[in-house]
């Protein structure tokens, strides 16, 4: 036998309980299994299967077991939910008599005393004695009772008195003699007190038939008179009750024996009695004896409980004992209620009295069964003797007795008279011709007309119009029986097609799937970004630079017609070709040059900005498609690190500003833009917004006088210009180094802020004629590094523009500094001196 993990026992009777493995269960085990009915499915060998009902809210299967013998897939509870079975009704309140009987009944454990002896079970009150059976052996079969009585009383002959033995002996020896009838009747049917008086009456042995009624009638009158004489002076109520009971029982038992027929007072029965008496006078002695014994047996058969002390064949003391038995039980019940604790002697005496009363009851039952056996044996012998001597008359006598016995019972007559085996149902005025079922009078179709049958029931299914199916069903296993047709329909409905079941299952899943609530975009919060995915992002185009808020009209000479990647600077860091940003000149070439932004242009943009600007990113879309890539972020960090050497760049600018006109070269022969670029000088106004020390910069009017406009001479070859620039820079290098050391100490105290911008200064509006890349050959240093337009250090324009003439500034200024400061914030640092976004391509 398979057992689970939790093996434990009951605290009451120490029997093993359910051994369900997942949790502790204190229910009783099923017979032959280690689990209760709730958890028996853990044992795979158990004849149960699991209910196939699946809950909709959690998609879990029911765990109730179903016997495999039942042809169903759902348990009773879910069949009730589905409407197949009717729901259970609440139990009605019990009747007052039943509740009273249940309250009086005491459990068996409460009947045990502390010393182990069992207290007598309390008897019901006198009001319930007539309702409850007092004798458990009253309706048992004869053979069973004989065995039980023999087991209880091994020596029954010892308990019988000597008088009873003499009576039994006289019955056994003289049962064939007709003359012994008065004596046997007097001894068997009358109480012992009256037997002596009845035997003292004169009896004529020559005429037994005439003497018998006189003796019986005389004994009857003498009995009543003797009872009146005996109890005349008694005033006890109990004695009067006993006298009435004795008279009633005596009249009931003696009159049938005297008349020789059943106890009825109808006219038909009296006529039958007269006919029988006349026939008995003309019959043979064997037939008379048979007739007498049959009457006696019939009288005993009509009394269902002939052995319960109502036969009066014993001493009168036994009747008193029977009366004391009831009073004893009531007394025991009263004592149990009044006295809870008694001594050992009292309990032992009560137990002995209980056993004595039980013994008397069993002896009385045994004597009654013995009398029944003797009477049946005598009747059989008389019947055999009469059949041998007078067979025709014996058969006629038996037939007459049978008719008399079956006359009061109409049911027995109908059953005995109709042996055709056909159905007795009447359909539309015609009798049914179908054969009846065994032991019934109806066929299968009309068996429901028999109200007394309990095996068949009507089909519980209903049609579409509400009418119930009337086909009989023999089904004792289901609570709602169905006929074959409706049972097949129910099976098809429960099983169904696989595709239909799967379809409904998916429909239920989709129906009960929780819907996502759409949140408004204004209430949606920015969630944390997930970690980097395994796939790398594609490189995206850089963010176009933000335009200044001032006048965006740029002069046409700042347009870049070609790629600016060829510009080199001595201070530009080494950048590979793939690290250069994409060309943005094509993107900004469509912007008109005379585009101006006013305050009204921002009236529609500013109200749309969120209140909390901490998490707001101007250059970030909904899907973050404009965020810079990791490569761009690393390049930006590297460029910012290279921009940390701005003091040296400023020192170079101040040193290059002291360079005069190039010797041996006529700068006026060059084009105007190149001459202005080479002869440019830094003045105090140029870097006024940087708040630098005035000692670092020379006054423009002393050291750098403006050159008057003159016709431009032809350009010098680029090679000569570059050579001259290199030689001049080499000659002035010691002086520049000295200036750089002085400027480091002075620029250490510069107030540089992150929020300042100098793009509105002279560098922002500087006119650069970039029509030809050969004009920038003079800016190329010996190291040959390139200067990109997108990402460059602020030192690049400082070193390159230090040689520009001052006259170029006067020609290129298109907007006053005061007008630009109205729209732009103060300059943050020197890092914004060189802004390539200011350069636009020429249309």
UniProtKB/Swiss-Prot annotation:
Compositional bias segments (type: Polar residues): 176-187, 197-216, 221-231
Bias (Pro residues): 705-717
GO CC aspect terms: nucleus
Annotated signal peptide: none
GO terms for biological process, alphabetical: DNA recombination; DNA repair
Subcellular location: Nucleus
Disordered: region residues: 159-216, 221-240, 503-550, 695-726, 791-843
Segments of skewed composition (Basic and acidic residues): 159-175
Keyword DNA damage attached: yes
Keywords in alphabetical order: DNA damage, DNA recombination, DNA repair, Nucleus, Transcription, Transcription regulation
Composition-biased stretches (Low complexity): 796-821
Chief location bin: nucleus
Biased composition, class Basic residues, residue ranges: 503-540
A Pfam family matched in the record: zf-C3Hc3H
PANTHER family assigned to the protein according to its UniProt record, in alphabetical order: INO80 COMPLEX SUBUNIT D, PTHR16198
Family note: Belongs to the INO80D family.
Oligomer status and interactors: Component of the chromatin-remodeling INO80 complex.
Function recorded in the entry: Putative regulatory component of the chromatin remodeling INO80 complex which is involved in transcriptional regulation, DNA replication and probably DNA repair.
Name under which the protein is recorded: INO80 complex subunit D-B
Organism encoding this protein: Danio rerio (Zebrafish)
């Amino acid at each position: 036998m398979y057992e689970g993990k939790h093996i434990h026992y009951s605290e009451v009777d120490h029997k093993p309980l359910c051994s369900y493995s997942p949790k502790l269960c204190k229910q009783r085990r099923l017979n032959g299994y280690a689990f209760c009915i709730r958890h028996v499915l853990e044992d795979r060998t158990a004849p149960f299967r699991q209910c196939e009902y699946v809950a909709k809210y959690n998609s879990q299967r029911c765990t109730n077991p179903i016997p495999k013998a039942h042809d169903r897939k759902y348990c009773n509870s879910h069949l009730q939910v589905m409407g197949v079975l009717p729901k259970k009704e609440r139990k009605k309140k019990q009747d007052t008599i039943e509740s009273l009987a249940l309250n009086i009944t005491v459990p068996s454990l409460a009947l045990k005393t502390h010393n182990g002896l069992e207290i007598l079970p309390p008897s019901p009150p006198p009001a319930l004695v007539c309702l409850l059976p007092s004798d458990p052996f009253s309706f048992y079969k004869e053979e069973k009772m004989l065995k039980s009585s023999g087991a209880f009383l091994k020596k029954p002959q010892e308990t019988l008195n000597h008088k009873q033995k003499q009576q039994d002996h006289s019955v056994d020896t003289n049962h064939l003699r007709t003359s012994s009838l008065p004596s046997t009747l007097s001894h068997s049917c009358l109480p012992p007190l009256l037997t002596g008086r009845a035997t003292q009456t004169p009896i004529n042995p020559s005429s037994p038939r005439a003497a018998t009624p006189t003796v019986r009638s005389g004994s009857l009158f003498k009995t009543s008179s003797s009872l009146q004489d005996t109890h005349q002076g008694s005033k006890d109520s109990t004695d009067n009750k006993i006298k009435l009971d004795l008279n009633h029982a005596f009249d009931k038992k003696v009159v049938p024996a005297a008349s020789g027929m059943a106890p009825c007072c109808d006219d038909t029965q009296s006529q039958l009695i007269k006919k029988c008496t006349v026939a008995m006078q003309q019959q043979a002695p064997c037939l008379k004896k048979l007739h007498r014994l049959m009457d006696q047996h019939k009288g005993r058969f009509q009394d269902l409980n002939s052995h319960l002390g109502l036969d009066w064949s014993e001493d009168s003391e036994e009747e008193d004992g029977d009366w004391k038995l009831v009073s004893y039980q009531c007394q025991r019940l009263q004592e149990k209620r009044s006295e809870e604790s008694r001594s050992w002697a009292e309990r032992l005496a009560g137990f002995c009295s209980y056993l004595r009363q039980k013994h008397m009851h069993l002896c009385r039952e045994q004597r009654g069964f013995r009398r029944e056996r003797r009477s049946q044996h005598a009747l059989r012998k008389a019947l055999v003797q009469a059949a041998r001597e007078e067979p025709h008359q014996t058969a006629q006598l038996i037939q007459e007795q049978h008719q008399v016995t079956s006359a009061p019972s109409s049911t027995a007559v109908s059953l005995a008279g109709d042996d055709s085996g056909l159905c007795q149902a009447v359909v539309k005025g015609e009798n049914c011709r179908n054969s009846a079922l065994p032991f019934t009078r109806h066929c299968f179709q009309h068996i429901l007309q028999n109200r007394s049958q309990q095996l068949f029931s009507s089909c519980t299914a209903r049609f579409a119009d509400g009418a119930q199916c009337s086909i009989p069903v023999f089904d004792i296993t289901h609570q709602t029986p169905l006929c074959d047709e409706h049972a097949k329909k129910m099976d098809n409905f429960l099983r169904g097609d696989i595709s239909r079941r799967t379809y409904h299952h998916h429909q239920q899943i989709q129906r009960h799937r929780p819907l996502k609530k759409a949140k408004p975009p204004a209430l949606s919060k920015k969630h944390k970004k997930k970690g980097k995915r395994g796939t790398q992002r594609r490189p995206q185009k850089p963010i176009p630079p933000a335009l200044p808020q001032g006048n965006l009209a740029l002069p046409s000479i700042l347009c870049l017609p070609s790629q600016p990647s060829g510009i080199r600077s001595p201070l530009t860091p080494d950048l590979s070709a793939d690290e250069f940003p994409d060309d943005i000149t094509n993107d900004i070439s469509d912007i008109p040059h005379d585009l101006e932004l006013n305050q009204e242009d921002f009236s529609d943009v500013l109200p749309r900005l969120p209140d909390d600007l901490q998490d707001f990113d101007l250059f970030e879309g909904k899907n973050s498609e404009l965020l810079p890539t990791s490569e761009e972020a690393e390049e930006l960090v590297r460029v910012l690190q290279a921009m940390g050497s701005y003091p040296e760049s400023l020192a170079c600018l101040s040193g290059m500003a002291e360079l005069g006109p190039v010797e041996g070269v006529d700068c006026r022969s060059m084009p105007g833009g190149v001459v202005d670029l080479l002869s440019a000088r830094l003045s105090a106004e140029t870097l006024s917004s940087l708040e630098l020390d005035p000692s670092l910069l020379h006054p423009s009017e002393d050291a750098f006088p403006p050159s008057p406009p003159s016709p431009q001479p032809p350009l010098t070859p680029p090679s000569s210009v570059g050579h001259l620039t290199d030689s001049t820079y080499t000659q002035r290098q010691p002086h520049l180094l000295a200036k750089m050391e002085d400027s480091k100490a002075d620029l250490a105290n510069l107030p540089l802020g992150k929020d300042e911008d100098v793009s509105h200064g002279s560098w922002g509006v500087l006119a650069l004629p970039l029509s030809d890349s050969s004009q920038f050959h003079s800016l190329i240093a010996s190291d040959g590094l390139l200067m990109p337009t997108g990402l460059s250090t602020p030192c690049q324009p400082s070193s390159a523009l230090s040689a520009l003439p001052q006259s170029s500034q006067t020609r290129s200024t298109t907007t006053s500094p005061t007008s630009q400061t109205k729209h732009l914030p103060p300059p943050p640092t020197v890092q914004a001196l060189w802004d390539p976004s200011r350069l636009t391509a020429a249309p």
